[in-house]
């Protein structure tokens, strides 16, 4: 989303985004009540946010532990052929998130597995491509943080004289 598009979002749009991120199952009538708009007005605003790609989807958040995935881990993957890594990620259902990154590693993958043997099997697939390093996630402190439009404060320009002082 560009800063120009950010400028077009008003306080109602921001509240709509906050409410839907907290509970995407709200009816349009209830959402309208919460943001002080009529149901047709809020429906139109949500439609525009979807059309602009700001709202990119709705999903259920599941508890991976309750689904049988007792271990979550991060796999850092070194340099390897991009297409081969992408293909392997797509073929690995245990891969919850995959990030192509800068720095020492080229990829950071988040995986969910049943146990240590399952972890070893998944990591071994990526070891065939390149070197890896694995960290088991002990505790999740923050996840699925709701985000609102970026609001960077304007930076004050300092004169060269004030910098030298």
Model-derived segments and spans:
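A compositional/biophysical signature of low hydrophobicity enriched in polar/charged and small residues
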Residues: 1-165
